[in-house]
């Protein structure tokens, strides 16, 4: 497989990663099927638990193989298998730097329980002492309550890192992408 810089590879994830050179990837983002029983057009999302976990271990090992020593691996997953996939990732050798909750407003409508309106985003690295995080990049900083609300002089004038609960609403993103000039 020809893996050019800044390209998206399309195909079976394990086969596609097996075609990549070992240690050639800076960032891997996985949003695998949640295995919650939905029947999609091209995929039946209802494997037996053990089969799903074995498949997950297979593709997580493939991620580990292609990731550079200082690379980053993000995993987006629902509630059903979040804990299991975190443990599998750690058993393979990944270190969890952050467990982020992504809150969204388009959750599945439920009639017998509270509506689920979040997903889990795990931030993994291979080496807890050698990884890229860009915490000094001002674009990654947000104002703090210490600064905005309390006018506390101890606040970092450059802001602070965001919380581990992210509110991302697709409507907000679309609004930012469409300008008044686009008509």
What would you call each of these model-derived segments?
Residues 1-183:
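Core catalytic lobe of class I
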């Amino acid at each position: 497989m020809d893996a050019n810089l800044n390209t998206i590879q399309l195909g079976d994830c394990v086969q596609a990663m097996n075609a990549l050179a070992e240690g050639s990837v800076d960032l891997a983002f996985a949003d695998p099927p949640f295995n919650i029983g939905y029947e999609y057009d091209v995929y039946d999302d209802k494997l037996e638990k053990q089969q799903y976990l074995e498949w997950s271990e297979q593709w997580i090992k493939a991620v580990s193989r292609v990731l550079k020593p200082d690379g980053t691996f993000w995993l987006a997953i629902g509630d059903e298998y979040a804990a299991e996939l975190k443990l599998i990732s750690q058993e393979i050798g990944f270190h969890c730097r952050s467990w982020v909750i992504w809150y969204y407003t388009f959750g599945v409508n439920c009639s017998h329980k509270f509506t689920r309106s979040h997903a889990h985003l795990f931030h993994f690295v291979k080496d807890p002492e050698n990884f890229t995080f860009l915490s000094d990049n001002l674009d990654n900083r947000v104002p703090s309550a210490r600064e905005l609300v309390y006018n506390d002089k101890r606040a970092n004038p450059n802001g602070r890192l965001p919380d581990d609960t992210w509110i991302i609403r697709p409507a907000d993103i679309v609004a930012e992408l469409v300008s008044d000039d686009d008509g």
